[in-house]
């Protein structure tokens, strides 16, 4: 367990640095960067998936996203945390995002990061185009 935790933490640090270096300006751009990172690290995702331990990375992923969101806009983040339902919204969103990643890594042929960004935009928008995430 400790070895896995160390590996996950190292990957999470790489992921965080990758996102920070690209500074996505909006949700679509974030999705492109996100799926580009995992596309470049597909071997690791495939190993996690084939060994049946990919689900264990989900909690590390949730912690990482929470940390990153607090760094990007502390004022907005503080307002969100004042909402008593914030933790439920956050858990729902990150779990959904991670599950999409799991499905995507199993695809052959795999969609490009831009195609996945388009899908994520569609998933997170109401029919009239209002962003829900």
Residue ranges and their predicted role:
Residues 14-21, 30, 92, 96-107:
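Solvent-exposed, amphipathic alpha-helical segments
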Residues 23-27, 50-54, 82-86, 109-116:
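Residue-level recognition of alpha-helical structural elements
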Residues 53-80, 84-99, 129:
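Amphipathic alpha-helical packing segments from all-alpha helical-bundle domains
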Residues 16, 20-23, 43-46, 50, ...:
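Short, flexible helix-adjacent loops and helix caps
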Residues 3, 7, 11, 26, ...:
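Residue-level detector of well-ordered alpha-helical segments, enriched
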Residues 1-24, 32-35, 39:
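An amphipathic alpha-helix adjacent to DNA-recognition modules
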Residues 70, 87, 94-95, 99-133:
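C-terminal peripheral helix-coil segments that are non-catalytic and often amphipathic
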Residues 6, 30-64, 69-72:
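Amphipathic alpha-helical segments used for helix-helix packing
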């Amino acid at each position: 367990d400790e070895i896995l935790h160390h590996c996950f933490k190292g990957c999470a640090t790489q992921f965080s640095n990758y996102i920070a270096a690209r500074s996505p300006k909006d949700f679509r751009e974030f999705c492109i960067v996100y799926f580009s990172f995992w596309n470049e690290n597909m071997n690791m995702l495939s190993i996690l998936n084939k060994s049946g331990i990919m689900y264990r990375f989900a909690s590390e992923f949730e912690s990482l996203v929470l940390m990153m969101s607090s760094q990007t806009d502390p004022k907005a983040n503080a307002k969100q945390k004042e909402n008593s339902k914030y933790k439920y919204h956050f858990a729902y969103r990150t779990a959904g995002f991670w599950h999409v990643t799991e499905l995507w890594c199993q695809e052959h042929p795999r969609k490009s990061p831009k195609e996945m960004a388009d899908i994520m935009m569609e998933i997170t928008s109401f029919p009239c185009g209002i962003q829900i995430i």
